[in-house]
Amino acid sequence: MKTLTFFGPKYGTQVSLLSPNVVSKLSRFPLTSFARKPTKPVCVKTTDCDLVESQRTFNKFPRSDWGDHFLRLPFNVSDMDMLTIEMNALKSTIRKMLMYSQDVEETKERILIIYLLVALGMAYHFEDEIDDNLKHGFENIETTMAGENDLSTVSVMFWVFRTYGYNLSSDMFRRFKGEDGKFEECHTKDVKGLLSLYEAAQLGTSTEDILDEAMSFSSSHLECLAGGTCPPHISRLIQNELYMPQHHNAEILFASEYISFYKQEDVHNKVLLEFAKLNFKFLQLHWIHELKILTKWWNDQDLLSKLPPYFRDRMVECHLYAVIYYFEPQYSFGRIMLAKLLVLLTVVDDTCDRYGSVPEVAKLLDCVERWDPELGESLPDYLKTVFKFTLDVFEDCERAGKSEEGLSFNVDGALAEWAAAEKVPTVEEYLEVGGVAVTMYATIALGLLGLGPKAREHGYEWLKSRPKLVHDLATKGRLMNDMGGFKDDIGRGFLANVVNYYMKEYGTTEEETYKEFHKIVRDLEKSVNSEFLKINKGVPREILSRALNCGKMIDVTYRSGDGYTRPRGKFTEYVESLFVEHMDAPVMQYASSSTL
């Protein structure tokens, strides 16, 4: 039986993905690590499992700020029905916009519309029309692009084709260079052209120097323009893009911002804008309904009163991850299940890394491996609670009918041994072992449970092949996680951090190390782009997009420190933009404003 191996920061874990025809317990997944950053230390330090719990050193976490917020929000199924009627009334108009023709200018216009569908978060409604247009468009791309000298148009078309896996040549950007081989200065005031060029450059591979030049050229001028005389909504878009490019942002998070931007544009398509509003509201009602279910479920578990406050209370944030993984309405059940499993991973991970002693955690993992409720009686009281919670979550998922694939725990202590013995591995060794410790493989595989049987089977077989794309995403996650948590890790005596290892191995300063890691991250992103272009025809987009979305979770979480452990700030803004904002607008407002 082939296996995928996962390691956590304190207790590495190995997981076996059983073939789909093996009937066993539902998906017993490994303990892997989100970020591991302390907040306020309490009690006194001990490593003896026989000492009473009141003497434990652990980092106290406050309760979630969200509490019962989503339980109190109104929800009416009839609102969703009304929104569906309104959207259906507009769909035919948009489909007409996407009708194929051989006219060159109309082809360009349709590709630009496809970009808007993606940017506004509603491309999933028109997948067949998009695929048909891109297939025919790519076959005639030379004719279509001949003589096109608008920087924004060329950049957007490049972005669309590359995003959908078509290897459009980056040589088309040479038309914007002068005789000196540099991008012409006449483009420095073209705000939309620079924005589009900056986004196009994000999709470059390691062999495309021209896109590196494009990124440097566009970013330097955009930084100047952002603080200049641009209209406020354009300045904000520039700032958002420079902070988190669209290519690295979650599609629906970008859409929540872009809808606000697009409606302030002097020239915009009213049908597309109206549909975007209706669609976002429709999705939001789905998410709110899911959060109601999850909040009630979390309250029923009552772990906040049963366990010491050593674990992160992140149910809402776990649902945000599930939305990033798949935001479309048909994945509602999958989001609920994935959120529960991510909450479980967080609780068990924090138990292992932040509170439990080595012998205690070994007992817990043995109980999970054997999957015998009676064995839990030998555990300390707090671990009985954790073990029961583990059993309950998986049985909850099993009752929901998702019990075809089995995943089993198996402990491996590589990182724990390094940390305990103060062994300093090479950076390459650490990344090979710790590369998936930020739940990359785990989250991809868990989320596949929400797809159909064929997609799940294909996805699991692909993961078992240890694809380079996923490995690169996991390595990027390891680097960004450890950069964000270096000071906190060292402050609490946890030396198993790639920044620490790199500094010791190469004799660099912290600043030099971070600078080098940012280069490595960019190289990994190029490698992911390259792998996507290579394999997208052999692996269904439904699966590949989930892996890429997990990569976007990394950027959303670690772009400004550690958003999962300390969600206040930018991470909270993401939660609010999807689940809180726009809620004041009643459904009837959308219904009445859809007349064009």
Curated annotation (Swiss-Prot):
One GO CC term, this protein: cytoplasm
What does the record give as cofactor?
Mg(2+); Mn(2+)
Q: What EC number(s) does the entry state?
A: 4.2.3.-
Alphabetized Pfam families for the sequence = Terpene_synth, Terpene_synth_C
**Part of which pathway?**
Secondary metabolite biosynthesis; terpenoid biosynthesis
Location of the protein in the cell: Cytoplasm
Grouped into one coarse class, the protein's main location is cytoplasm
A single MF term (Gene Ontology): terpene synthase activity
Q: What domain of life is recorded for the organism?
A: Eukaryota
Binding annotation for Mg(2+) 3: 481, 489
User: How, per the record, is the cofactor bound?
Assistant: Binds 3 Mg(2+) or Mn(2+) ions per subunit.
Q: Which GO terms describe its biological process?
A: diterpenoid biosynthetic process; sesquiterpene biosynthetic process
The residues that the entry says bind Mg(2+) 2 are 349, 353
Per UniProt, Mg(2+) 1 binds at: 349, 353
Query: Which keywords does the record carry?
Result: Cytoplasm, Lyase, Magnesium, Manganese, Metal-binding
Q: Where is this motif: DDXXD motif?
A: 349-353
Please give the record's comment on domains.
Answer: The Asp-Asp-Xaa-Xaa-Asp/Glu (DDXXD/E) motif is important for the catalytic activity, presumably through binding to Mg(2+).
Q: Which protein family is it in?
A: Belongs to the terpene synthase family. Tpsa subfamily.
**Name of protein:** Putative terpenoid synthase 5
Annotated gene: TPS05
